[in-house]
Amino acid sequence: MKQLINNDWWPVLKPQFETANYQQLHNFLVDEYGHQQVYPEMHHIFEAFNWTPFSKVKVVILGQDPYHGPGQAHGCSFSVLPGVAVPPSLQNIYKELQADLGCPPVKHGYLRSWAEQGVLLLNSVLTVRAGQAYSHQGHGWEQLTDAAIVALSKRPTPVVFILWGRAARDKKRLIDLKRNFVVESAHPSPLSAYRGFFGSRPFSKTNQFLEMTGQAPINWQLPSTVDHL
């Protein structure tokens, strides 16, 4: 499975694959993928890392675990593949993006153009059993993704960490706040979006920090159509 990381994330994460924790996780996943329906497909597990190399990361949007419906998850937080209905949380993200920067919502949920500009779409847990949210929590993914957050936090070039919801905000403890910038609010889920997500302006705040630190801002406007995977 570790062979699925094919860029400069590998030397960053390699020590995690040499731990007893990872061996336990590996054994758990072999059993789960062998006997259960698990998302995403195995070759997509590390998609977030492959889409956004370590040296290119400017922003991290931290999710909790993958979508657990058929065909939704493909290894990147909040994103879904072309042709899949836009999930409610992502619909709310689009609403806030329009209110914040005037970007009209698109009809797909494929966030690759963000990733290619340096937005790491990272979930804390990288797999899930079909129909069972949070079912793979506590089996070892958190140690690996925490290590990724810590490594980014220590990089010379500062990073923006976007933390939506209690689980993501708990990761603030891993981040060097003197060097980096945290944008945090309620989760965009319909259950909580009106409790502080709407009106939080995460996209403009992110770009202001990037420009202040000499980095190019993110073009948050997604293409209206998607013609590549």
From Swiss-Prot:
GO molecular function list: uracil DNA N-glycosylase activity
Protein name, UniProt field: Uracil-DNA glycosylase
UniProt record similarity statement: Belongs to the uracil-DNA glycosylase (UDG) superfamily. UNG family.
GO biological process assignments: base-excision repair, AP site formation via deaminated base removal
Disulfide bonds: none
Lineage of origin: Bacteria, Bacillati, Bacillota, Bacilli, Lactobacillales
Pfam families referenced in this protein's UniProt entry, alphabetically: UDG (PF03167)
Principal subcellular localisation of the protein: cytoplasm
InterPro entries in the cross-refs: UDG_fam1, Ura-DNA_Glyclase_AS, Uracil-DNA_glycosylase-like, Uracil-DNA_glycosylase-like_sf
Domain of life: Bacteria
EC number: 3.2.2.27
Stretches assigned to coiled coil: none
Active site (record annotation): 65 (proton acceptor)
One GO cellular component term: cytoplasm
Keywords: Cytoplasm, DNA damage, DNA repair, Hydrolase
UniProt key word DNA repair: yes
Compartments reported by the entry: Cytoplasm
Organism listed in the record: Limosilactobacillus fermentum (strain NBRC 3956 / LMG 18251) (Lactobacillus fermentum)
Reaction(s) this enzyme catalyzes, per UniProt: Hydrolyzes single-stranded DNA or mismatched double-stranded DNA and polynucleotides, releasing free uracil
EC supergroup of this enzyme: hydrolase
Purpose of the protein: Excises uracil residues from the DNA which can arise as a result of misincorporation of dUMP residues by DNA polymerase or due to deamination of cytosine.
